């Protein structure tokens, strides 16, 4: 009868396991992907507004909704970000708006919110895109 406890206690198993661990750890450390913050270079300038009333409303704990879709049919994926709005007790000098960024195809995004007419200033937490009316164009639902 083979005992698993005696098999795992053998020195060659322990040594090979440790060596495998260190070799794999070294390989993954050398080839690890790195994330680089390119927000400023990309042209995306967004700051989420949660309403900040100080009353601890549930809305103040939620983040922004985001949708990636090709709004202008140029085969580059564009970005729409939903923003919050002022809650009772909070007044911003400039109302926060949702933003549509057009992908220029070179890693740079351009704010086309005003041109596209999608600068909603009401409180939002999500959005979805699909061809809702079956006309072949992507529709945006906020």
List the predicted regions and their residue ranges.
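Bacterial N-terminal signal peptides
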Residues: 12-23
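Acidic, glycine/proline-rich Ca2+-coordinating loop motifs
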Residues: 1, 24-142
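N-terminal secretory signal peptides that target proteins for export/translocation
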Residues: 1-9
């Amino acid at each position: 009868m083979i005992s698993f406890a005696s098999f795992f206690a053998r020195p060659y198993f322990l040594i090979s396991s440790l060596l495998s661990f260190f070799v794999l750890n070294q390989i993954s450390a050398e080839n690890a992907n790195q994330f680089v913050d390119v927000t400023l270079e990309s042209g995306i300038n967004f700051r989420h507004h949660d309403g900040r009333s100080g009353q601890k409303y549930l809305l103040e704990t939620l983040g922004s909704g985001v949708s990636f879709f090709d709004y202008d049919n140029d085969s580059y994926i564009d970005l729409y970000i939903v923003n919050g709005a002022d809650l009772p007790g909070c007044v911003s000098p400039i109302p926060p708006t949702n933003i549509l960024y057009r992908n220029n195809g070179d890693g740079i995004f351009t704010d086309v919110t005003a041109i596209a007419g999608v600068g909603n200033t009401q409180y939002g937490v999500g959005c979805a895109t699909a061809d809702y009316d079956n006309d072949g164009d992507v529709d945006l639902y906020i």
